[in-house]
Amino acid sequence: MQPVCSLVYSLGIASEFAGKRVGATRIYSRLFLISYLSRLLVYSSTRLLVYSSTRLLVYLSTHMIFLPEHLPVAAELRAAGFDVADYPSSGQERARRVLLLNLMPQKLVTELDIARTLAETGQAVHLTLVRLPGQTFKTTPMEHILQFYRELTPEMLAEADGLIVTGAPLENIAFEEVRYWQLLEQAMDEAAARRLPVLYICWAAQAALYHFYKIPKHPLPRKMFGVFEQKVLQPESAAMQGLAPAFPMPNSRHTEVRRKDFPADSGLQILCESEESGIGAAFSEKNNATFIVGHLEYEPFTLHNEYLRDLAKGLPIQPPLHYYIGAPEAGRPDYTWHAAAVRFYANWLDACR
């Protein structure tokens, strides 16, 4: 593996973002090509990964991601050139210990998205897959769950540096009617009591905002579907470092939270917002929790695949907005959110100390 390829890759990512205002319809064809081709060629353990919208800084890293032994997505990451180690393994004691509470039905897809994005930050991460006690699943073989997922316990939360809670396709169900709601509430309360850094994604963000602040979710007249420019409202916040003045973020949801429902005395900070898609992310200093309603972890073709899936089911769906290069039929996504995803997750990992 040649470090120069990694440098080209990193410069490609940084160039996608540095010094440009990220418009939702802007095409980054040349810069995306640099980033994409370099990513296909090689990933080195030496990466330049610190950048901002106004300057480019050099940071060399020799870290890797630690995953459960024989986890299928580990092989995919290795094939893409990522530095992946099975645990237990030497060096893992210096890695950030992150728990992934994966509530999505297609668990392997989400495992890959999260693991890939964490690996792209260049920081050493020990990722543990967890599930709520007694949870069973219909769409992922239980053999996979029993082999790779551990039941979440208070002791695990006490030892962790951070927790990621994914979304779930439960938007049309009242929170209290979700079969594992009480178990999820217990986990959220335990993490908040320890001030463990938690990243709540999409439905989980709405669920946590409802649990802690009674902020309701509101149904949308049609699916919020596409890549939407987020205006950074708190550029000085740790989560938004290097993302101002704006960045693109994929959204795929049927409900939303609204600014008017945020209690004035909650201490919640709205970090970013979109004229089209509404509130993008918020932060609670009290609970040390970040709530993001979009999916920066998505790989380039996720929205396209969701679009084809909904079409095949005969569901009312429009092509994802601000996403395709050319006509939707060509199926050419514009991966404009890649740099923002790496930066956002790097910022969050920095808080996991």
Per-range role (PLM):
Residues 1-4, 10-11, 16, 40, ...:
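Short polybasic linear motifs
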Residues 19, 29, 34-36:
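Generic detector of N-terminal low-structure segments
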Residues 35, 145, 166-169, 328-329:
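Short glycine/proline-rich turn/loop motifs
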Residues 133-146:
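N-terminal beta-loop-helix "entrance" segment that forms/cooperates
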Residues 165-234:
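Cysteine-nucleophile active-site neighborhood
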